[in-house]
Amino acid sequence: MKGILNVGNTCYFNTSLQCLVHVPIIKSLFVERGYNGPCSFTKGFSEFTRKYWDDSLKITFNVNNLLGEFVNKFPRFVVGRQHDAQEAVLCIIDILENSVPELKKHFYGKKIQETIWPGGKKTHEEIFSIHILTSTSTSLGEMMRNSLKWNVLNDYEDDDGKVHHVATTRCLF
């Protein structure tokens, strides 16, 4: 069994690391290839990932050096204070994808917004992580399904500047 030493309100960081090393592409990339680039955080993360998945090691990890590198890049994560694990995960992903650009295609997909009005149709494609519309639901699946539903737009202006009384739009993932 393996764990990460909590040195006072570092559970957000420890949890973030544990989540990310279980992402198959991250595990595969850093265990099989490692990282030899200039980013000291990514070097430390790569080493941590390799050791984490080394079955011969049954240890508790001290990630203070890695945490220090993280705080150097994101000073708002003051050591000793409570922080949000989701925010830390996104910041770690930001570091990793800048160090290893091929990771971007695994963390981001495409969102296609489709808008239809009388006499026309337009699609707009953009890279995204995930978009969920605000909802009172507690079910992630329901929130995702609701994000795909058609919405009515009143007085929609198309790319040619023509205003249409009504149009419908939806996002496709």
Task: Give the label of every model feature segment.
Residues M1-F173:
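UBL (ubiquitin/ubiquitin-like) substrate-recognition surfaces
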